[in-house]
């Protein structure tokens, strides 16, 4: 099975700049794998200090760009993992999340984590089919 790294402007370069040893998007075997995405502003490469709803929207907007760059779409996402720093954000994250996935959402895991080296509250990864 061939593995192809997909470069996504505004996302991949942020991870490289931070020295994080991962690929933002990998296409292999008919699937697209999107690494956990923090709420990065694709134009500035910075993680802004905004509320959890705005962070979730930024993460899912970036995810949309990533799956499209790999030849898929959000309606072809089959699995997501949502990482959150405070379980109290569950409803706020879900309010935004459901707007991206509609009536047929993918399988999902919701994980409460401690924190990250940078100041943000939500990160989401996904697997999509091509």
Could you say what each language-model-derived stretch is?
Residues 1-61, 65-78, 84-130:
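N-terminal presequence-like segments and the immediate start of the first folded domain
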